[in-house]
């Protein structure tokens, strides 16, 4: 399909294909959401300065587009994105066919000057390029706010009107305007929007089969068409980029004090230099975007991150009141020789340092079910404190501990099997014992736990299952499962 226009237009090399125009239009439509996203990210860091700009983004973008597009139309003959695709805009001659092929071949320079956009044509094109897209965005936004919810209610069999939208007994001018505006969005704008897109489709099809010179109905209204840049256009653009030739008056002006390096930063020189540099910024930004897409999609970045983390020996986080890793390493070796390959049995092994009592909830004053602190030895460093198996899909909690994603997800939701067994009295949580430094309290709690496990007595109302809390520390996890982060080990 992309060669069809070329076969039909073998005698008109300056007429672009429809696919070139669609690619240019697609690039032009991608600029506003991209800039809005970058501005939103920057607003999160500096909301004091950028929040108002983000709230008025459509107006600010329309104003900047007006300045940039006017400069490119006057100097390069096309819009910012059209210049990137080597396209331009020119007037259509009032001849029979609107074409002068002989003059185009014999005198391309004078033909270019005669078809160049005049000042009135520049403002007409600015109305089409900036004004109509701005009005379209505002109407689409207003339709999504005022008309789309009611339309969905009607389709689902809901109420057909909203009494709050009726005019009050003595309405003001603003209330009358908003009432008429909402009525237009609900009753007229859907048909108007359909006619807008159907007219563009009709002109695109007519342009594809060489039945019209205009690819858009708005270009037909202002008498402007889009063409490829000719050799005369490239020569004129090269002269503009090189700068105007120096005259004796300009040379004397440059020789004045302060007109050298500081003259480059004057508003008269900085304005065109800044706008001209956008010609190089657009392809550079596209290349950077494609590079970032490849970087995140490929496995190369993961390999580099994995190599960087292999050399780091990050110790486990220490919580106040728990046994430090240095004290755990000082255990007698005879106590750990029962089953060194099983991390579950290692947690059950007795030691001279007893575990502290479980944390107490500040709201319900009930003990919170937690799991023991993982051992600090290198063999069990990559094991999950909850399931005591090798880490699968490692996920970090806000407290700094790393668990299996399935374990921490079900734990925060209160659905883990260890929590269910503990609260039902089926067991003490596989490897958990509520010991403490106090012998009397520890024996009493241990006896109560063991008796509850033997008799199958439920612990509901006497314990908290740890739902929404860190399994090791018992601290509340802000955001629940939304606060979890994947890590690379």
From Swiss-Prot:
Pathway(s) this gene product operates in, as recorded in its UniProt entry:
Protein modification; protein ubiquitination
Q: Which residues lie on this side of the membrane: Peroxisomal matrix?
A: 1-17, 75-118, 210-280
Q: Cytoplasmic compartment: which residues? A: 46-49, 157-172, 309-489
What GO terms in the biological process aspect are recorded for it?
Answer: protein import into peroxisome matrix; protein import into peroxisome matrix, receptor recycling; protein monoubiquitination
Q: Where is this region: Disordered?
A: 316-359, 433-469
Which InterPro entries does UniProt cross-reference here? PEX12, Pex_N, Znf_RING, Znf_RING/FYVE/PHD
Tell whether Metal-binding is among the UniProt keywords: yes
**Gene3D superfamilies this protein is in?**
Zinc/RING finger domain, C3HC4 (zinc finger)
User: Which residues participate in Zn(2+) binding?
Assistant: 384, 387, 404, 407
Question: Which membrane topology term applies here?
Answer: Multi-pass membrane protein
Arranged from A to Z, the UniProt key words for this protein are: Membrane, Metal-binding, Peroxisome, Protein transport, Transmembrane, Transmembrane helix, Transport, Ubl conjugation pathway, Zinc, Zinc-finger
TM segments? 18-45, 50-74, 119-156, 173-209, 281-308
Q: Name one GO cellular component term.
A: peroxisomal membrane
Protein localization? Peroxisome membrane
Q: Name one GO molecular function term.
A: zinc ion binding
Q: Which domain of life is it from?
A: Eukaryota
Q: Per the record's keyword annotation, is Transmembrane included, yes or no?
A: yes
Where in the chain are the RING-type zinc fingers?
Answer: 384-444
Which family does the UniProt entry place this protein in?
Belongs to the pex2/pex10/pex12 family.
Fetch the PANTHER family from UniProt.
PEROXISOME ASSEMBLY PROTEIN 12, PEROXISOME ASSEMBLY PROTEIN 12 PEROXIN-12
Q: What domain comment accompanies this record?
A: The three subunits of the retrotranslocation channel (PEX2, PEX10 and PEX12) coassemble in the membrane into a channel with an open 10 Angstrom pore. The RING-type zinc-fingers that catalyze PEX5 receptor ubiquitination are positioned above the pore on the cytosolic side of the complex. The RING-type zinc-finger is degenerated and only coordinates one zinc ions, preventing E3 ubiquitin-protein ligase activity.
Q: How does it assemble?
A: Component of the PEX2-PEX10-PEX12 retrotranslocation channel, composed of PEX2, PEX10 and PEX12.
Record's function text: Component of a retrotranslocation channel required for peroxisome organization by mediating export of the PEX5 receptor from peroxisomes to the cytosol, thereby promoting PEX5 recycling. The retrotranslocation channel is composed of PEX2, PEX10 and PEX12; each subunit contributing transmembrane segments that coassemble into an open channel that specifically allows the passage of PEX5 through the peroxisomal membrane. PEX12 also regulates PEX5 recycling by activating the E3 ubiquitin-protein ligase activity of PEX10.
Could you identify this protein by its name? Peroxisome assembly protein 12
Origin species, per record, is Emericella nidulans (strain FGSC A4 / ATCC 38163 / CBS 112.46 / NRRL 194 / M139)
Q: Point out the gene that encodes the protein.
A: PEX12
């Amino acid at each position: 399909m992309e060669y069809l226009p070329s076969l039909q237009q073998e005698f008109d090399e300056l007429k672009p294909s429809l696919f070139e125009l669609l690619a240019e239009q697609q690039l032009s439509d991608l600029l506003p959401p991209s800039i809005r996203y970058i501005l939103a990210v920057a607003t999160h860091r500096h909301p004091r300065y950028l929040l108002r700009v983000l709230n008025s983004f459509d107006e600010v973008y329309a104003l900047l587009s007006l300045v940039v597009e006017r400069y490119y139309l006057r100097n390069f003959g096309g819009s910012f994105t059209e210049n990137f695709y080597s396209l331009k805009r020119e007037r259509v001659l009032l001849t029979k066919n609107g074409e002068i092929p002989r003059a185009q071949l014999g005198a391309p320079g004078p033909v270019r000057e005669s078809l160049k956009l005049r000042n009135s044509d520049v403002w007409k094109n600015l109305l089409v390029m900036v004004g109509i897209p701005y009005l379209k965005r505002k109407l689409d936004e207003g339709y999504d706010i005022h008309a789309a919810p009611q339309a969905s209610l009607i389709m689902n069999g809901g109420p057909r009107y909203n009494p709050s939208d009726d005019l009050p007994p003595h309405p003001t001018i603003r209330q009358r305007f908003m009432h008429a505006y909402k009525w237009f969005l609900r009753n007229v704008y859907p048909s108007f929007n359909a006619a807008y897109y159907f007219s563009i489709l009709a002109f695109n099809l007519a342009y594809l089969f060489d039945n019209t010179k205009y690819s858009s109905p708005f270009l037909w209204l202002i008498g402007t068409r889009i063409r490829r840049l000719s050799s005369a256009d490239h020569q004129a653009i090269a002269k503009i980029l090189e700068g105007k030739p120096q005259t004796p008056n300009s040379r004397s002006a440059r020789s004045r004090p302060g007109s050298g390096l500081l003259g480059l930063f004057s508003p008269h020189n900085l304005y065109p230099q800044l706008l001209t540099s956008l010609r190089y910024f657009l392809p550079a930004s596209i290349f950077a975007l494609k590079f970032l897409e490849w970087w995140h999609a490929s496995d190369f970045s993961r390999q580099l991150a994995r190599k960087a983390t292999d050399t780091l020996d990050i110790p486990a986080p220490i919580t106040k009141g728990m046994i430090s890793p240095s004290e755990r390493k000082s255990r007698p070796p005879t106590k750990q020789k029962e089953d060194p390959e099983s991390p579950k049995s290692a947690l059950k092994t007795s030691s001279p340092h007893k575990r502290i009592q479980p944390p107490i909830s500040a709201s319900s004053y009930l003990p919170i079910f937690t799991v023991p602190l993982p051992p600090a030895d290198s063999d069990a460093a990559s094991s999950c404190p909850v399931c005591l198996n090798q880490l699968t899909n490692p996920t970090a909690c806000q407290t700094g501990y790393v668990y299996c994603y399935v374990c921490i997800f079900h734990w925060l939701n209160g659905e883990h099997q260890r929590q269910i067994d503990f609260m039902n009295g089926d067991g003490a949580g596989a490897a958990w014992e509520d010991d403490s430094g106090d012998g009397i309290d520890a024996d009493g709690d241990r006896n109560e736990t063991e008796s509850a496990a033997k008799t199958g007595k439920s612990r509901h109302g006497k314990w908290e299952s740890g739902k929404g809390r860190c399994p090791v520390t018992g601290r509340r996890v802000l955001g629940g499962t939304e606060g979890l982060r994947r890590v690379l080990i």
